[in-house]
Amino acid sequence: MRKKLLVVSLLLSVLEIAITAQEKPARRMNYFPEGRDIVCVNGQNRYTRALYGGHTLFRLETSDRPIFATYNNEKSKNIRFYLTHRGLTLRLDSTDYCEARYQGGWRGYKVRDKRWGSAELQVNSLARLDNEGAIWQFKASGFEGDVKLSVKMCQTAVLKMNRGGDLGLVPRSNFDPSQDEKGLKTLEWDATGETYLVFSDNEMLEHPTTEKGREIYTLTDEGRKAIVERVEFITPDPYINTLGANICAAADGTWDGQTWQHGAIGWRVPLAGWRGGYSGDALGWPERQKSHFDAYTKSIVTDVPQIYPQPSQDTKNLLARAEKKWGTGMYSNGYLCRLPGRNDVMNHYDMNLNFFDELFWHFRYDTDTTYLRKMWPYIKLHLEWEKRNWDADGDHLYDAYCCIWASDALYYNGGNVTHSSAYNYKGNRFAARIAELLGEDPTPWQQEADAILKAMNRRLWLKDEGHWAEFEDLMGEKRLHKSAAVWSIYTPIDCDACTSEQAWMATEYVDREIPHIPIRIKDSDMDGKYQTVATTNWLPYDWSTNNVAHEEVMNTALAYFQAGRSEQGFNLLMADILDGMFLGQSPGNFGQISYYDKARSEAYRDFADNVGISSRTLINGLFGILPDALFGKCYIKPAFPKEWDSCSIRTPFLSYKFHRTATQDIYEIEQNFAQPLQMIVKTSIGRGVFVETEGISDKKQIIVVDRTNLPKGKRNTIVNSSRTLDESQQYLTKMGLDEPTPSAKFKTIDISKYFNANVDDIFKNEYLSPRPPYTTLEMPLHGIGQWCHPERMVTIEDDGFRAKINKKLFDTGLGFSFISPTTGHNIVYTSLWDNYPDSIDIPLKGKANAAWLLMAGSTNEMQSRIDNGLVIANYTDGTQDTLRLENPINWCPIEQDYYLDGLAFTAAEKRPYRVHLGSGTVSRHLAPIVGICNWEGKTRKDLYSAEPQIIENGAAQMLKMPLNPKKSLRRLQLRTLSNDVVIGIMGITLESAPK
């Protein structure tokens, strides 16, 4: 029996290694940089690079070869071309050779085929700006004799597409011709020389005269160039040089004529928050910014006072989020509503923080006092609303109510949160300065800003570890959650809620603790050179709590640049550029989700959140242009790689050329701000120390930094994190993950008189108290789910486990058993919920080397990398040993298995033994044996996806708690520490060494 178990264990271990060390396959470079173009030869991606044209949802989908589709809901069309020469007709997407180029809103092709001899066809495509249409330019050269072009246009294979038919959401084949070529239209023309084809959204195809076609094409291209040539980067790095035109085109794709949208394609809906609104100022569209801000300030509630006290949780959503009711704290004066120009449409987000941060950034570019005065009432309303709702206890630290992109499944239970506190610090600091400029008393806002910063440093900054905590609990033990997400690093840095030394140290936390994932490239010397990052190291996975998201990577790169860590920032920037724009399916794409995300993989194109923060990462970060018009200054704080000796940037508001000599850094600057600003160059000398070289406020100037006069950089203490994963055997033993000792003696302990529940009661209960006294996002009523999905439920059923019990003993198959009943209560639960005691003492006698514990309970992503509970062994001499129950090391959620990949999702080298409650099966690798399903109960066969691995009927777990064999036991105490969770013991068996 032992041999059979050993063989099974070894086989499962091999399977576990295969599952938990899963790098995604390396990709070949799809695209390469050449000047401002992104180029591919004989590429295979279809309908992946969108050209946007005007400011509607219409777009032209282009491919790596000249086959196209238009998207316009139910009017979407497939458009394909044919060339006929010497009696041979070829579809243009099937030739021997095709070079495709993309540059900000334009896609061009050089097409050749051996059957044409030395002839070549140039195809240029544009989406029109003046209507929902497109134009193609054809230039045929080297053809001997007649050459004709023809076009077929028909309905696409699928019309109704999820998320607008975006990448990663629907198959690209949806844009192929419909099977019956429904609505087929054709056109043929003489293709000699230069010819054109025009598509208009009234479903017409037109072959105009060359003169008319050239006029339309030139006008369209000039309009495109006015958009994409506003920003230019010239650097030693060819990848960076492509970004100016492409980011402008992507940003323009997210503009609807009045406001910035959530995305250009998949999320093409109005959105006041997130980071899309940074694009306008960073890329030099101040008129668009004012349009955006004007539209949404009309969405701010101004005539609904708060009349209902906090909390105001929604019973229909099982108390997980705020009730949508006018006059509650959230839905009252100061609240920013969902749609532009309307202050009567509720949303479930706090969009205020991001929206007003973008407004404050606008004032850094342009301190127009007339516009300041116009916006000032809304700024005051916003800050009053934030204070009233999210700092209701007045301690100057703020709760976070889904106020950043990573908001789904993110909830803080009324706690004190780093990122929201940082935003409010900045908001109050800017309000104080604006008040001063407008002749008002700045004191109230300055005092609040000072108090927030003091509280953040005193309560959220981890001095010994050199970074901010994610949050501080309001309830229960009021503990700090130290495993911070990247947003809890980059937000306080971006909001200047820190010293430059703190910023440097906080980015070192990212180096140590945030998962890094290598960018794998086939047949390239860049293979593995760069690494991208996940947003957190939290488990179990839920959407937006542990992802590889382009916008989060870019914002983290910006934080590195701001902290003065230029090399690390550039490496992260390059990782993201390669991942999304050159290895991905869409050239020059500013997408949302990375290929390396184990739940979604590559998804979405030109997502506004990424476009906005990427524009800032490049302009405010890499090139370091930091206007501060509120104080009449503009800082240039470059973060170039050390090998760059020259580069330049051109934007509508400021351009400069940089070059380095043996001893000097020279900046040739030309500014075009609305108000002339004093130029100041900030040079990093390491570890958060910068030296300023002052210029003047003239339009054109040269600033020279003499590096021989720079002081040596300051050295600070290097902080080591205590949470770096320990893979030693001693650590595994300490965390209860050891195997049974061969030939050990086991003594089962009857703890049935302490049982207070059935194990499957856990999600049948209503957990009503204690709950926060303030409106917040919190655990749903039944102790499972999250605010986006409060209705989530699973079946926990222990019939199979009980059926395996023989004479009150459950045989683990590992050489020992637990006493457990076949009917009635079979667990003692503890919790900070009032439903159960927060701790339980179980008397014990004798001596033992270890205590085997059969346990079950709950945990979630907001309780990850923190002790959820303690098991304390008390000895008769007054001493004790403690087993810490930490998610995900040795504490598992009853309803699911952890997905582990050795990258973004890591735990200890060994998993805890799990006991399937539906069958009694025992294994460290339960999911491959009993199967998994999704939240909806549908069977899942893909063990390589991070999506939740729900175990039907649930699973308990077993831990081996080490004890001191020389000491006599008095009692075992189970104590729950984390809010929201339930922890229970089903059985105890003592292990003693063999004589």
What is each model feature region?
Residues 25-111, 200-212, 216-231, 236, ...:
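An extended acidic
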Residues 72-79, 83-131, 555-733:
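Non-catalytic C-terminal accessory modules of carbohydrate-active enzymes
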Residues 113-159, 428, 654-685, 834-852, ...:
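Acidic, contiguous internal or C-terminal segments within carbohydrate-active enzymes
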